[in-house]
């Protein structure tokens, strides 16, 4: 059984037991989170596709932890002017473990 749900403007395909990194959620570590924007639920033989959401669909997850991703380097450069600017960015994320998928 797997599901596709939406969180943080992105869509994630998950199954029970999977660990997923999502955009940062303001939830404490160890707390339970429910995602109700479920777009698709597949259970072996049957596939429930929402229009746009599956009625009564829910993905339940437990927050494993928070962290920051790898550094992305941004370089702005102007040719022939001896001008360059180097910046970096590390995006915050929340790691969750999927505990249940309810249709």
Swiss-Prot record:
GO molecular function list: rRNA binding; structural constituent of ribosome
Alphabetical GO biological process terms: translation
Entry-linked SUPFAM superfamilies: L21p-like
Key words, A-Z: Ribonucleoprotein, Ribosomal protein, RNA-binding, rRNA-binding
InterPro entries with a match to the protein in the record: bL21-like, bL21-like_sf, Ribosomal_bL21, Ribosomal_bL21_CS
One GO location term (cellular component): cytoplasm
Coiled coil residues, start to end: none
Subunit and interaction comment: Part of the 50S ribosomal subunit. Contacts protein L20.
Family membership noted in the UniProt record: Belongs to the bacterial ribosomal protein bL21 family.
HAMAP family to which the protein is assigned, alphabetical: Ribosomal_bL21 (MF_01363)
Main function: This protein binds to 23S rRNA in the presence of protein L20.
Protein name (database record): Large ribosomal subunit protein bL21
Organism in which the protein naturally occurs: Shewanella denitrificans (strain OS217 / ATCC BAA-1090 / DSM 15013)
